[in-house]
Every structure is written in C-alpha cells, then in structure tokens.
Amino acid sequence: MNKSVIVNFVICFSLFTFHFSLASAQSKHDTITEQDYYDFFNSTINPFPVTTMGGPCNPDSVKICNLISTPEVGVLRDDTSEIFKDTVFSRADRAYIHKQALRNKNLRWKQGMMHGVNVIDGADVQHIMDSAGTEVGWPVYYKKYKLGYNKFSVPLYSLDKTKCIVYRAYSCSDNFGLGNTNVFIKKGDKWVLLKSCAPWVH
C-alpha cells in the first residue's frame, strides 16, 4: 500500500477517534443543570475580595446585594482565551466549555435561589439606562433598587465538574464598577478561587 495513503488513513483515524471520544465524554457529562449554577454560587467565597471601594460601592459591604436577572454572556466568551493559555483545562475541557457558552441564552436568575442575593429585572434596568442615559439613569435606578448591582455569568464546567470558569461584575454608578473572570476548583464541598484574569475597575 502506498505510504502516503497509510499516513492519511492514520491521521483520519486518529481525528475520528478523538472526536468520537470527546463526543462520548460530553454525552456522559452533559448533565449540567440550572441547580448546578445555584449550587456553585451558594458554596463559593466572594471572587474579589474588594479592598479599593467603600460604602455602597463595595459589593462586600452589604448583606443582600442586587443581581441582574440576565446572566452575562459575551464577556466570558472573550475572557476564556486568556485562561486557555494555561494548562488548567484539557483540550476536551475547552471544547466542552465552548459548547456550554453557546447555551442558556434564555436563562434568567430566579429569586430565592442564591444566598444573599436580590434578583432584579435586567430588562427594566436596561430600559432605565437606555431611556434616560446613564448620568440621569443611575439616580432613577437608585430610587427603585437602592443599591448597585452585580452581573454573573453561568459557571462553565470542565468535563468532570471539578473546575469552572465564571465572570462577575459590579456597578454602582456611571463612574464606579469592577469585574473579572475567575477559574475555580472544587475542594470538598466548596469552590475555591484558583486563577483570576481580565480584571477591570473604573
């Protein structure tokens, strides 16, 4: 048999085996539920912690914080490129994470499912800011919601669900806010911060 034919066959077979193994692994682990998201946030230490912002603009300074009902999506997809330069996640994990990032666009956080969180209507907040502009919109917002707000992404898990990527941002005015993307690893029944990237503060 021609040597080039054999080489091509081996390459094709290897690629087929990899994709089949990946699909099989994903199908076995593709059982992430909405409850998994809530369990993560309810067993995770604050991703920041915040040391540079005080009073009502420090998300750690209040017992009950506001959370926008619509999970953050786009920023997390962009930030994973930096995280994936590390060796924390395997190639199969990365493919699985990308697959998860395309789902749950219609998910809305539910009231009472996360400890210490008051879920507020993301569409209403967006309407306030869009219709009045942020300079006028923030005073209108505060009259209704009293405190600044958090935005969380859903956690994106590794195949074995022992590691995940999650984004959190906090805004309290036109001039103050912060956020970053984090990698967490599960130790016992707690999620512990492993790595942070792409932080921003304004």
Language-model features: where?
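Bacterial Sec-dependent N-terminal signal peptides
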Residues: 1-33
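Compositionally biased, low-structure terminal segments
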Residues: 10, 14-21, 41-42, 85, ...
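Flexible low-complexity loop/turn motifs enriched in small/helix-breaking residues
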Residues: 25-163, 172
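Exposed beta-sheet edge and beta->alpha loop/turn motif
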Residues: 161-187
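Short beta-strand edge/turn micro-motifs at domain boundaries
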Residues: 182-201
